[in-house]
């Protein structure tokens, strides 16, 4: 069956929408169960079990504890062998002290909605291909997708998509910066600061020197790059030479390529501070957040479906160029790691919150009925574009060619 003929039928779009509508109450239950039981990074045991069990009970093949993370899962579904593979990412971690103030409960059920509606189409029309739901924990400061990517996740997939709630606007794509965090520990030698200071090696001096040098580096940064940092510990008593100090820093850049250029100027600062103070230093680079490389082919199709078939007015969903202006901000998402492996988009949907993500106002809106309905509508659009990937060769080739060109420009293409 020619895939484009399927999608030109209003009947198939109706089937996608209907499959989600038939399960909207169950999806609402799952969303609220995640929302009411917030679990922070890499401790999402209940949410992981809830979602993976639900898919398994529908007949999906589920693996848990995958790609290096105990609370990650991968669920697969296919009817006819062969074909392409599309993936929907589900997030479910919460924020410490704030709960689901980033709306990850909505991300999870939006991806489930996409998956089960596409499942219905594959069954009814015997469409070749594989649907994957990837359970991705630890997005908030843990870089969960980066960890999973380094362990082989998303390799061989043809497309990967997800959605994210936003305060009061929607976009067919998002722009994020690349970011890398580093924890720095200086080890000195304790001594009494009054009676024998010459015997000490001051770790506090080391972290202060490092912090000052980082501040001096800022004037040399290119536009769009930034450095943030804080001193976490630098001694306990004024009359004791501190033998331990610790700081946390992060560097941000428009792309991971620019981040790689900045890192060699940033990292030597810590060894220099240690050498100058007679201390030793331990430098631990933690989660890498790569910039999101949005696939325009997918994003344009997402917007078209939203406006032409899913009831959104053109003024409610900016064009791609308008979106790049609207969502040009310094935030980060670990979805960037996925977007360097296969074509993808992370669309945004309005939840009519009183404040931006990571706020009480956003948390309150994330459990609301309006947010739930918008998450499901975004799930409908993602299902439709992924059905295009599975069934429309010309569309899939265009998407792939764009991805290859983007990776070549980023110096990341390895045929």
What residue spans do the PLM features occupy?
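Histidine/acidic-residue-rich, glycine-tolerant segments that coordinate divalent metal ions
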Residues: 71-76, 93-101, 105-106, 114, ...
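Acidic/His- and Gly-rich active-site-bordering loop/insert found
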Residues: 2-131
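Non-cysteine beta-strand/loop elements that form the S-adenosyl-L-methionine
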Residues: 87-89, 183-187, 346-351
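Metal-dependent amide/peptide-bond hydrolase catalytic core
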Residues: 205-415
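Short Gly/Pro-enriched turn/cap motifs at secondary-structure boundaries
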Residues: 63-66, 138-139, 172-176, 325-329
């Amino acid at each position: 069956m020619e895939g484009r003929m399927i999608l030109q039928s209003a009947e198939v779009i109706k089937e996608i929408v209907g499959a989600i509508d038939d399960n909207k109450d169950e999806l609402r239950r799952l969303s609220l169960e995640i929302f009411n039981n917030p679990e922070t990074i890499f401790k999402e045991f209940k949410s992981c079990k809830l979602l993976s069990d639900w898919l398994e009970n529908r007949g999906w093949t589920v693996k848990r504890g995958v790609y290096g993370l105990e609370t990650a899962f991968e669920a697969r579904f296919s009817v006819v062998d062969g074909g392409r593979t599309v993936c929907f990412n589900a997030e479910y971690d919460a924020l410490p002290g704030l709960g689901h103030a980033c709306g990850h409960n909505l991300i999870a059920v939006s991806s489930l909605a996409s998956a089960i509606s596409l499942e219905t189409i594959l069954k009814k029309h015997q469409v070749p291909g594989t649907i994957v739901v990837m359970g991705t924990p630890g997005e908030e400061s843990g870089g969960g997708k980066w960890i999973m990517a380094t362990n082989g996740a998303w390799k061989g997939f043809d497309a990967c998509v997800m959605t994210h709630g936003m305060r009061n606007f929607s976009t067919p794509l998002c722009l994020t910066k690349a970011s890398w965090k580093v924890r720095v520990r200086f080890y000195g030698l304790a001594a009494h600061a009054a009676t024998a200071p010459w015997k000490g090696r001051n770790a506090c001096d080391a972290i202060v020197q490092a912090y000052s040098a980082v501040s001096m580096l800022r004037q040399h940064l290119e536009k769009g790059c930034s450095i943030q940092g804080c001193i976490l510990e630098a001694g306990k008593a004024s009359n004791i030479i501190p033998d331990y100090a610790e700081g946390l820093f992060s560097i941000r850049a428009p792309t991971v390529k620019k981040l790689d250029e900045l890192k060699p100027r940033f990292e030597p600062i810590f060894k220099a501070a240690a050498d100058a103070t007679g201390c030793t230093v331990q430098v631990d680079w933690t989660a890498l957040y790569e910039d999101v490389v949005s696939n325009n082919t997918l994003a344009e199709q997402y917007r078209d479906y939203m406006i032409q078939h899913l009831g959104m007015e053109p003024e409610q969903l900016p064009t791609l160029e308008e979106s790049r202006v609207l969502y040009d901000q310094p935030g980060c998402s670990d979805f960037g790691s996925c977007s360097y492996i296969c074509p993808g988009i992370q669309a945004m949907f309005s939840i009519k919150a009183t404040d931006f993500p990571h706020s009480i106002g956003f948390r309150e809106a994330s459990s609301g009925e309006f947010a739930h309905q918008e998450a499901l509508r975004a799930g409908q659009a993602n299902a439709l574009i992924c059905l295009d990937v599975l069934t429309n060769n010309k569309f899939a080739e265009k998407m792939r060619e764009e991805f290859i060109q983007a990776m070549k420009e980023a110096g990341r293409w390895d045929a």
